[in-house]
Structures are given as structure tokens and as C-alpha cells.
Amino acid sequence: MGFTNLVSLAALIEKAFPIRYTPAGIPVLDIILKHESWQEENGQQCLVQLEIPARILGRQAEEWQYRQGDCATVEGFLAQKSRRSLMPMLRIQNIKEYKG
């Protein structure tokens, strides 16, 4: 199946965990993103609030320059958190400072 799986989100960096490395030496950075916005749904304004775990791999994880409390725009895709958990996790492919 070739379904589209693209996510773009402006969010607050709620928490950034220490960088770790896979057994193959790939850097991994796990973060928690917090988002709040007003969206239109069925002709009504709806307050959307969420927290979602996110992961950055490779060079971007090593070059991490953001801090807790910073706002960023992230782009990536959703995947299950782990082999044992079907909970969603945002796999970040691009991150940049949010400039409102």
C-alpha cells in the first residue's frame, strides 16, 4: 500500500531527552512536542491540544540546537513508537525555528 503519511506541525519543545546511540552508532534524540491551536471542524472553531513523542535520527540529532521551551516547526511522518507499542510517534525529518 502506498498511502501518504506526512505531518507538519508547529509546536513547543516540552522536553528533550539526552542523546543516545543505537548499537550501529546512529544518534537518536527523543523529544516531547506540545501543540495548541484553533482549528475549524464541521463549521465550528475547535481548540486542539496535544502532546506527542517525537524522534530525530542521525545528523540532525547530533546537531540539535533547541532547548526546552523553544518553538519549532517540524515535518515528518507517524510511525509506531516501538515494536511492542502501537502508540504513534512523530519521526522528524526536518526541524526549524518557528517564526509565527
Curated annotation (Swiss-Prot):
Residues 4-99 form the SSB domain. PROSITE patterns: SSB. GO terms for cellular component: pre-primosome complex. PriA:PriB complex-catalyzed duplex DNA winding is inhibited by CGS 15943 (CHEBI:131351); PriA is the drug target. It comes from the Bacteria. GO terms for molecular function: ATPase activator activity; ATPase binding; double-stranded DNA binding; protein homodimerization activity; single-stranded DNA binding. The keyword ATP-binding does not apply. Changing residue 21 to A: 1.3-fold lower single-stranded DNA-binding activity than wild-type. Pfam families: SSB_1 (PF22657). Keywords: DNA replication, DNA-binding, Primosome. Transmembrane segments: none annotated. GO terms for biological process: DNA replication, synthesis of primer. Coiled coil: none annotated. Stimulates the DNA unwinding activity of PriA helicase, which does not seem to require single-stranded (ss)DNA-binding by PriB. Activates DNA-dependent ATP hydrolysis catalyzed by PriA. Weakly binds ssDNA. Weakly binds double-stranded (ds)DNA, a partial duplex DNA with a 3' ssDNA overhang, and a forked DNA structure with fully duplex leading and lagging strand arms in vitro. Belongs to the PriB family. Homodimer. Component of the replication restart primosome. Primosome assembly occurs via a 'hand-off' mechanism. PriA binds to replication forks, subsequently PriB then DnaT bind; DnaT then displaces ssDNA to generate the helicase loading substrate. Interacts with PriA with high affinity, independent of DNA presence. This is Replication restart protein PriB. It comes from Neisseria gonorrhoeae (strain ATCC 700825 / FA 1090).
